[in-house]
């Protein structure tokens, strides 16, 4: 059932009585997840990532935590690993490529457009592509991260709406946070404002509305990019919190919002060499962005990148001869 709405004092911004729900991966359907995302903005899916996959990905990534990256936007007690596709095939194929995550991203981020080429009409439906990926290790003493919307870098300006009016195309990015360790309020769990994806993007965050995204190892948190969120302080005595995050973005722009910049947040084309791209499955090569978007955006020498680099498989937009 959709959450009830009340008007704020200025009569402009709906205040959504939303919540953070936990669903079991063994019983939940894709339609269930879509419903919770539309109405609440985020949802925890328990037991989505197996122990075997976490061990494989951890063996690839965790050694890099010792090679510290300058924290930048993050606390000095936060260690981050970047360029994950260049460090872990398993991360790309089994976490970023998780079928539930990909199906959810397809639903919210796939564009649909019709256009004419001469006397023939075509329908274009380019799928979303990789936006970013990071691994986080937060240590005791880690500071609170400011609340923010993931889509702010794409200048995604949105009006307030009711949950039943949520249109596909409103969000430009969608993310998944994977718990490698138990994640609690005390050791730095993500703070999340349920329903904030329905607010105007001009509204500031209200810390009093946050809830901690507490998870066990193997659980994931799926979140629309217009939701306010941010890491909590790690006030535990000795607990390290390890989290993998990855986001996908629309590969083209629909005019449902006044988004001005739609580029991938992480420049994967400089961080992942072509020889590394060849190692991935054709499906993941496309999802990482090494493929033309339907009908033929992202070409090299007016050809699909797959042909230029002799990558296997066909792209989505090869039906128009340019």
Swiss-Prot record:
Its EC number is 1.14.11.-. It comes from the Eukaryota. GO terms for molecular function: dioxygenase activity; metal ion binding. InterPro entries: Phytyl_CoA_dOase-like (IPR008775). Keywords: Dioxygenase, Iron, Metal-binding, Oxidoreductase. Its cofactor is Fe cation. Pathway: Secondary metabolite biosynthesis. One of its GO terms (biological process) is biosynthetic process. It is an enzyme of class 1 (oxidoreductase). Fe cation binds at residues 148, 229. The keyword Iron applies. Polyketide synthase-nonribosomal peptide synthetase; part of the him gene cluster that mediates the biosynthesis of himeic acid A, a ubiquitin-activating enzyme (E1) inhibitor. First, himA, together with the trans-enoyl reductase himH, catalyzes the formation of apolyketide chain, which is then condensed with leucine by the NRPS activity of himA. Dieckmann cyclization and release from himA gives a tetramic acid intermediate as the product of himA PKS-NRPS. HimG then catalyzes alpha-oxidation of the tetramic acid ring, with a subsequent rearrangement to yield apyrone intermediate. Belongs to the PhyH family. Homodimer. This is Dioxygenase himG. It comes from Aspergillus japonicus. The lineage of its organism: Eukaryota, Fungi, Dikarya, Ascomycota, Pezizomycotina.
